[in-house]
């Protein structure tokens, strides 16, 4: 991979939180926003941003609790709050319509935003952003609210008592990242780690994200409501899935039928992080979609 020339950093305020984003320049081009997934950060999009910056004004936020953005007071993180932050950022940028590309949690945020403001989004790419597959949701639905709330309380207390993992070096943290995603190259893992860790007072390194972003809240995921929201999306939508991923196939499980204008790309030899695992394939598919 060629050397990446970095973007500039900026900040904005949402719900009294100071949130960070990077800007890849080319302000006269159409706006395109890349939204990362959970426990990730803005610089995980660097390879994609660098490929798109020639034709687009690429902006990439760190979601609250991630990267160089502030952590939420109380460690409370929900999709509506992330959507609020993206709405605030886009209003600060003040350029519509916008193209959104999101991965996982970021894909869910992009889908929710577009359902609320369909006239503001020109095109949408969601990499495994539809949430848990229906079979997984069915298993969760069997638990009553008090059991889900009890599990949430125990999880919150567990995270409160747990010290975040520390690594003696960046190389050690990068090795952990490779364990998490064996599709990554050593170069990719190191780049993601360099931008994903902060140095602690004792000289060790820790991930920048707030551990509380891992907490699963007890509210049920309402598939009927989600399908109604997806049906509000008016723009062309590209759904991307890795064939080696845990995420369900939205054609096989029927979720794609909720969209007005959507198609699916299943990428071979890719897991959940399709844009890392098969970068060239991802760029080719997204480039063709955006050029239509």
What are these regions (language model features)?
Residues 107-118, 124:
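Short glycine-enriched nucleophile-adjacent loop
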Residues 15, 22, 50, 59-105, ...:
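Active-site loop/oxyanion-hole signature of alpha/beta-hydrolase fold enzymes
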Residues 267-283:
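Catalytic histidine-centered segment of alpha/beta-hydrolase-like enzymes
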